[in-house]
Amino acid sequence: EIIHYTVSAAGIFNEATVDQKEKLCGKIYPWKQTRLVGDSVAGYQAATLGKPGVLVICGTGTSVIVGNLESKFTHLGGWGPLLEDKGSAYWIAVKAIRAAIDNFENTGEETAITSTLCELYEIKNIQGIVPLIYHPEFTRDKFAILAARIDKALEGKDKVFQNICEEAGTEVAKLTITAVEKANLDISPLPIFFSG
């Protein structure tokens, strides 16, 4: 007999509301005995096995969750692309496209990102990317995939893209340090897990 269910879903930062639980868990019987948590909490529990530590999630979005010695969580980031998940693959792709546009308009550095995007999307120049990225099917996960495709094509040989990636790493590191400090997690060695 199952006494309690725990279900995780994206976009939930704390314990879910009754409405969220009913909407997302209504088919699980009995849903009143179901705990609905954010996907980062589930990821944290899987990575740390419930012990104090840090989970850095950096994929389509970016978030950091820290569990301290008192089993209290600090969660930073994870606000989604409209509110700028700094350091995420989505963020990297947008920065790369912006760098290509700046290159095209002669307002930024020369970069192989421009020709790479033209080759990947079989477009004459970077202006051709506009209808593609504004198409409803070009979702944020496709931006994230684009970051990986650019990285693979450039093979670490483009200074502008390397700078974007270094900036992404710096932003994620700053977010992680801030989360650890806010959580008052002062243990050594500090268990840090990465996902994404």
Summary of predicted features, one role per range:
Residues 1-4, 26, 47-54, 98-196:
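ATP-binding/phosphotransfer module of carbohydrate and carboxylate kinases, centering on a glycine-rich
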Residues 1-35, 48:
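Short beta-strand-loop/turn "lid" adjacent to the catalytic site in phosphate-handling enzymes
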Residues 10-12, 79, 195:
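Short strand-loop junctions, especially beta-strand C-caps/beta-turns
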Residues 16-19, 60, 177-180:
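Short, acidic loop-to-helix structural element flanking the phosphoryl-transfer center
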Residues 23, 42, 115:
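Active-site phosphate/pyrophosphate- and oxyanion-stabilizing loops and adjacent acidic/basic residues
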